[in-house]
Amino acid sequence: MFAYILRANQSRSDETDEFFRRFKDTPGLLHAYSLQGEDDLNDSVAIAIWESREAAERYLQSSPLKRDVDQAMPTVTRTFYSVLDSK
């Protein structure tokens, strides 16, 4: 398994909710979590768990949704992780 954490300095909106709804249908995506900071509503995080690094790379290289997110949320960053253990 492979994971990445997407972080943006942006509050939740109808647009971000729609992005997440579209994202959940991505092939190869096993789990996705949308988080918002309790103390800072602009602290937005999405955690994506993929079946493989290749599945995540396919999404990152070719998805129109990724381009839409990057344009709408210019502060977005993605950090990549290998999943070592899970429950």
Predicted regions and their residues:
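Short S/T/G/P-rich N-terminal loop/turn motif that feeds into the first structured element of a domain
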Residues: 1-61, 71-87
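Cell wall/extracellular polymer interaction/catalysis modules
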Residues: 65
